[in-house]
């Protein structure tokens, strides 16, 4: 397999959409998304991020299970040079607050509830202003850097915007503005902050660069002899390195298909496989 020319995640997705545009990139249940469709959604999300003032170097947190929206958000964040802060879906309320504050997240893309845990209610408990303010202008002393909260599952109230409403903002920024932002991204720039489990102390943020994720991922795929004909079942969490910094770039750099399982369930896994 030929090593991709791209050295940043945004460029990598563009490269794959050109060379393998109609090929299926993502499978989630009955939904199939091609590389071209993935890129289109990423570009819309990236322009929407620019519309709310997210810029190169800003931290944007993602709190979600293994879903296409996680991957759309992550690559959109990377495409404009911002840093995707992956939050564990096993986080306690204290750990969630710690990760958002410690990373200085300017925006949060989230599922309101995951496996029965109401994360949005936990944020409201710390930040009652969330229910009283306007979207994209959130201001709370508990999370002083956070200005934008977007829910994937559509819950809206006060400063909370839905995924669809946020995506509709993409028309406020041109394709040229996105290209300018993308051109500013350096291969050595940080693309991910992935947090450790926090078993011995508070979770620690580990910074990973675009080039390192791509190069390491390609080499992993080479050792596994992956090709564009392969499908990779991905049930390990994307918020940890095995998911987003190992399995994901390994299959993506080889043009294969990612089959997402939202969270591990043995019976469901056998059906998917």
Residue ranges and their predicted role:
Residues 75-80, 101-102, 240, 252-253:
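Short hydrophobic alpha-helices that are characteristic scaffold elements of the AMP-binding
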Residues 52, 80-165:
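Structural core segment of the AMP-binding/adenylate-forming
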Residues 81, 199, 255:
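Conserved G/P- and acidic residue-centered "switch" motifs that form tight phosphate/ATP-binding loops
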Residues 214-234, 239-272:
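Conserved AMP-binding/adenylation subdomain of ANL enzymes
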Residues 6, 22, 142-146, 150-157, ...:
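Conserved pre-ATP/AMP-binding loop-to-beta segment of ANL
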């Amino acid at each position: 397999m030929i090593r991709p020319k791209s050295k940043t995640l945004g460029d990598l997705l563009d490269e794959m959409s050109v060379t393998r545009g109609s090929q299926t990139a993502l499978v989630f249940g009955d939904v199939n998304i091609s590389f071209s469709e993935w890129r289109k959604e990423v570009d819309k999300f990236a322009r929407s991020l620019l519309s709310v003032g997210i810029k190169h170097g800003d931290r944007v947190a993602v709190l979600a299970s293994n879903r296409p929206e996680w991957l759309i958000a992550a690559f959109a964040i990377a495409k404009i040079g911002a840093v995707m802060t992956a939050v564990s879906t096993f986080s306690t309320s204290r750990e969630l607050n710690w990760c958002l504050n410690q990373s200085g997240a300017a925006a949060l893309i989230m599922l309101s509830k995951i496996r029965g845990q109401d994360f949005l209610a936990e944020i409201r408990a710390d930040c009652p202003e969330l229910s009283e303010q306007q979207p994209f202008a959130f201001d709370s002393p508990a999370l002083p850097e956070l200005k934008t909260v977007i829910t994937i599952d559509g819950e809206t109230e006060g400063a909370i915007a839905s995924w669809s409403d946020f995506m509709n903002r993409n028309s406020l920024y041109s394709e040229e503005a996105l290209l300018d932002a993308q051109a500013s991204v350096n291969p050595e720039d940080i693309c991910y902050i992935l947090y450790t489990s926090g078993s011995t102390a508070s979770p620690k943020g580990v910074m990973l660069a675009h080039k390192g994720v791509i190069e390491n991922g390609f080499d992993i795929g080479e050792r596994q002899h992956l090709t564009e004909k392969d499908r990779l079942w991905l049930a390990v969490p994307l918020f940890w390195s095995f998911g987003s910094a190992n399995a994901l770039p390994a299959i993506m750099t080889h043009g294969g298909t990612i089959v997402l399982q939202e969270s591990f369930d043995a019976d469901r896994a056998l059906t998917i496989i």
